[in-house]
Structures are given as C-alpha cells and as structure tokens.
Amino acid sequence: MTDPKTSKEQKYDRQLRLWGDHGQEALENAHVCLINATASGTEILKNLVLPGIGAFTIVDGHKVSGEDVGNNFFLSSSAIGKNRAQAATELLQELNSDVSGNFVEESPDKLLDNDCEFFHRFSLVIAVQLPESTCLRLGAVLWEAGVPFLVCRTYGLIGYMRLIVKEHTVVESHPDNALEDLRLDQPFTELKRHVESYDLDNMEKKDHSHTPWIIVVARYLEKWYNENNSQLPKNYKEKEAFRQLLREGILKNENGGLEDEENFEEAIKNVNTALNPTKISSGTQDIFNAEQCENITSQSSSFWVMAHGVRDFVQNEGNGNLPVRGSIPDMIADSDKFIKLQNVYRDKAMRDAAVVSKHVEMLLQSVGKTPESISEQEIKLFCKNAAFLRVVRCRSLADEYSVDTFNKDEITSCMDSPDSEMVLYLMLRSVDRFYQQHSRYPGVYNYQVEEDINKLKLCVNSLLQEYSLNVNVKDDYIHEFCRYGAAEPHTVAAFLGGSAAQEAIKIITHQFVPFNNTFLYNAMSQTSATFQL
C-alpha cells in the first residue's frame, strides 16, 4: 500500500519545491471564497484547486446562460438554467479529490444585506466581475474584518486586479539575486578559528586547489588588512588590487606558469560578493522601527513577536548584526573541507536562533502567552530570512475612490504618457459610471455602440472633472471600450486566472511578495503595469 505522504509528495512535487511542506500546509488549511463563477472566476479557482487549496465556496446568484457556456470551459450546455455556482463547483471538484467545494445560490448583495459576517470566515475573498457599488460595500466589510480581498476583472482585452489587505507580512520573500551572508568583514569567533586552521603557504597542491574560495578570500583579507590599516577594499581600484593579490597566490608549476586552480578563479570572481559589508537593510530596519514591533501585546501576530525577538538579538548578542543565515553557496572544494565550512555557518545559525528563541519566549510570557505558541521551527525559519522580511500595506477601496484621498499624483504623472496602462484604469472607472447610470455596460448591444460612444465620453469627462484630473483620454480608448461590450474572452480570463491564483497563493502561504495594489494587463499590446492607487 502506498504511503499517503509519499503519494502527496509525488502529486505536488513541483510546488513543494517552490513553497515547501509548510507552504503546502497553509494552502491546505485555507478556505477561499469566490464571488461569481464567470470564465475568470473558474480559471482562478482551477489554479487553486489543482495545487490543493483546502476548501472553496462559490457565491453566485446567476443562472447559467448560453453566453456562459460560450466562454467558460467549466460550464456545459446541459447546465443552462442551473445555478452557476452549483454547476461550476461540481466540475471544479473533479480536478482534485483532496479539495472540498461548496456553493451558495445567492447574490453577494443579498448576503451583505442579511449576513455580512458570512464573509469573515474566509482566508481570502476573490470577487470577479462585480459592480462597483457591491465591490465598495464588500470591501468595507472585509477591511473592517481584516480579511484579504482580491478584486479581479476581465473587460474585453483588459485584465485588472486590485489587492486590498491592511497588513500582509512575508517571512519567505524569496528575493532574486540575494547576496550571501558570509560575514568575512566581521567574522564570528568560530569562523575566525576555522579560517586560521588553513595554512595556504604550506599545503600540498591537492589541498591548496581544493580549499573553499571563502577560506581563500578570508586568508588573503588578513594579508590585505596588514598592508591597508585593516580597511576592506571598497572601490573598484582597491578590489582590483585585491584580485591581483589573489592571483599571486595561485601555485606555479616547474616552468613558472600558473597552475589550474579553479578555487582561486572562483575567489577572484566572487570578490564583490565576499567583500559586501555586513549590514541590516533599510527594509528590515523599518520593520524593527515599526510601532507593531515596538509594542507587543497578546494580540500581536507571531511575525511581530519574532521581529521583536530578532531586534533584541541585534541590539544585544548580535552586536548590531542579524542572526547568521547559515547557508553557503556551492563551490569547488573537496567534500570534507566543504562540509566542515558549511557546519561552521550552520552551527552558528542554530546558536543565534536559539538566542532569539529565548528572547521570543520571554516576550510571549510577558504578554501572557505560552512559549509553545511559536515553534522552534518557525523561529529558525524567521532568523534564516530576517534579511528579507517584507510587510505589504495596501490602501482601502474607500480611500482609492474618495475624492479627498485618491492618489492624484500617481494618476497624473502616469498620464503624462497618454498610452500608459493608467488610461485603462480610468476607462474601467468610466464604464462603471456608465453602468450606474444605464444599468448596463457600453456596447453590450450592437445597435447601440455608436450611441454609447457619446454616452461613455460623457462618463469619462465627468470622472475627470469630479476628481479634478487635468489629463487627456484619447477617443480611441472610448471607441475600443464600447467595442468590447463588457465581453470576457477566455484567453484574457485564462491569463488573469493564472495571475490572480499566483497572488492568492502568495497571500495564503505568506511567501513571495504580492503586488501593491493595482495590476493592469493589456492583451492588445501584451503589456502590464502595477500602480499604487
């Protein structure tokens, strides 16, 4: 009989490499609410059901129409006349037996009228193709409850996403091109001792050629310090001189030529990395200085408790530095030397994490919580990623839509270029205005397209006037949006479905950094942009 754990590892192999067991566990404990099972909505859920989201609930009061069947792969003609939430749930559940699917045959407006607390239970609410008025109502309820809200929309060849979350903390941000944490400029005692155990001047050739480049750089730094008042090589000229010092250390053969020592070549190549000063990034420093980090209460999340614990470590045992990360890059070296060096860093990281753990324990006790409420594993992970912590704070929809608090500067500066994706945002706001006035979107009926162009132009002008925006929207965009007729082409819905599911997974797992706060995709020009609105 197959071990269920092994079978799960095989099933989710690729994604486990991305976000690990703990990320998968967060996904499997999540309950996502989708409002409206349109083409975009079912595409988003498909991309959450396949990786194994714990549960989903679809809220949709609409019946399946011929139009739905025409653009939605998850609805068949036999479903016409049935409730759309029910029909989509049945087919989506077939994708993954591990996932629990539920549906509510009611409009979000009715739920907001009768039981707005219904939405409090979810890990994330995703609203698709929702009218502006409902979106604002639901946004206010979720903002108050602290539930993350993702608004998605496909409008013709335009894709739109808006993330609304008061505070989202990220421990594992997985940054690209992260610098190694080697501490060669400020070596800790055990590293110093380990480096000193290597005598490069009196070594067999084989050992000399298989000494890790970190050791090579550290030993030659000592020589550099002796000649340069213990100052690190800082500028290009000094670093080039240091590289030359390393080149001179390469062994010579009996003919006086240089031996082929790849470890020294690695050392020369990695001079910039190795000599990067050990310091705390401004982003991490901002987190340490935040009020939430300063004032820990029994309501504080584990992120802020651990941030305070790391800050205490920095101010005391760390002598101004973060806990050692504990990892080193692959390099040319024999296994024994590499493992010994790796263990020096790893052991130091574990000792630092243990000290942070003590700070966290004392902190938890001071606010009346048990030390077990944050596990050792969580603290180790936090210490390992302390240099890459992120906090994302989005503005509320109410602030974005209010004439007093909307982001005028962002809109105006972007509209200096009349074909900026910002014009798509203004057009989406304008078609919503059209809907409020006419209870339909422009161009939905072919015979009204010409007439709707003028009506939509009035809506664009009234929007710009109301918000005192002195910008120009080309007539081409007004014509284009009328031609869209609020259609939801599957190609755009599929792209949006993949993008939105990716952001949803970031929110649920607290890994990778979500966008802040508005994303626009233009399928005509194959471009996209992110704005803070």
From Swiss-Prot:
Q: Where is this region: Interaction with uba3?
A: 330-343
Write down the superkingdom of origin.
Eukaryota
Q: Fetch the SUPFAM superfamilies from UniProt.
A: Activating enzymes of the ubiquitin-like proteins (SSF69572)
Against Gene3D superfamilies, the record matches this protein to: NAD(P)-binding Rossmann-like Domain
Q: What are the alphabetically sorted keywords of the record?
A: Ubl conjugation pathway
Q: Does the keyword Glycoprotein apply?
A: no
Q: Where is this site: Interaction with uba3?
A: 210
GO BP annotations, alphabetical order: protein neddylation
Q: In which pathway does it act?
A: Protein modification; protein neddylation
An example of a GO molecular function for this protein is:
NEDD8 activating enzyme activity
Q: Which InterPro entries match?
A: APP-BP1 (IPR030667), ThiF/MoeB/HesA (IPR045886), ThiF_NAD_FAD-bd (IPR000594), Ubiquitin-activating_enz (IPR035985)
Q: One Pfam match, by short name? A: ThiF
Q: Which CDD domains match?
A: APPBP1_RUB (cd01493)
- For whether the record's keyword set contains Cell membrane, the answer is no
Q: Which family does it belong to?
A: Belongs to the ubiquitin-activating E1 family. ULA1 subfamily.
Relate the assembly described in the record: Heterodimer of uba3 and nae1. The complex binds nedd8 and ube2m.
Function description? Regulatory subunit of the dimeric uba3-nae1 E1 enzyme. E1 activates nedd8 by first adenylating its C-terminal glycine residue with ATP, thereafter linking this residue to the side chain of the catalytic cysteine, yielding a nedd8-uba3 thioester and free AMP. E1 finally transfers nedd8 to the catalytic cysteine of ube2m. The covalent attachment of nedd8 to target proteins is known as 'neddylation' and the process is involved in the regulation of cell growth, viability and development.
Return the PANTHER family for the record: NEDD8-ACTIVATING ENZYME E1 REGULATORY SUBUNIT, UBIQUITIN-ACTIVATING ENZYME E1
Name of the protein in question: NEDD8-activating enzyme E1 regulatory subunit
Record the organism.
Answer: Danio rerio (Zebrafish)
